[in-house]
């Protein structure tokens, strides 16, 4: 079919020479699933639309991009999967999402507008922000919903959000935090719902453009990827500089006055897929950790470009295979001897906390987790 032929061309699927490296690399395939990235490539190359639409395994893919990185033919598997999911969505096929699809429903409500949000309740009196205009826009993402939605996980993702604002205030900046921000639409896009994603993109791009901000900072790796790559077609004027909070802090680390008597703490770091393999950002969070007195970073066996995914980026992969990946990753973190697993994305925290709550593991994989900004904020005088 012409659509599949064009997609195979754009993603270089036609260049696949069936070496099997993608399957050998895939975290899902490695733990015993019969899933293989090649099945989508072969279906696209041969124009098998019915097979693609009827294959629920398309939503098994973590879109972690490990296969992209290892493919000798440079096939863009991740882009191929995202586009094939759009095809499925148009045919009425969607993934089976956990929690009754409640999170997807909230995103779609935001996309349609008219939803009354209370996005500012997390801001304490000690945090200075502007509601509309300023040089720096702090993009909060959906963290204010996560802690309330997943109460059983005892999450503290908002602590990282507060820490980011506190650090900007310490640097003499008063960021814009808008009550009119909406979900970036990352999960809708990656589950195939392009129409609602585009509604969110247009709203959010206009919101930030109207603020006059020259820089947009976010603590969410998925929001970062969405703003840098997926929002690009929606900018009518040159976009603001878009950075992760760890990049922003690394740029200003010399201006942060850290306490000289910092408590000794061994940490390890989880590289988010969207920030690492999707955007190539590895050094900034490590630069921030290296600057904090008393903090010693011990890398996991799989780190940097080879880091293992947290296995649940779009709320559509929550199955026994994802849990096995999460448990394996937490065991790897514990094996470093670290007291704290530092993250740069709230989604990583959520999925790992979920895995830790498995009663069958008896606390075997428990480890404290903190956002990189939270750790830095606690160390600032």
Residue ranges and their predicted role:
Residues 4, 13, 43-183, 187-218, ...:
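Iron-sulfur-cluster electron-transfer modules
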Residues 16-40, 277:
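A broadly conserved sequence feature marking short terminus-proximal activation segments
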Residues 146-240, 274-291, 295-381:
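Cofactor-cradling patches in redox/metallo enzymes
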Residues 238-248:
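Short, conserved active-site entrance elements at the starts or edges of catalytic domains
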Residues 245, 251-292:
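C-terminal amphipathic alpha-helical segment
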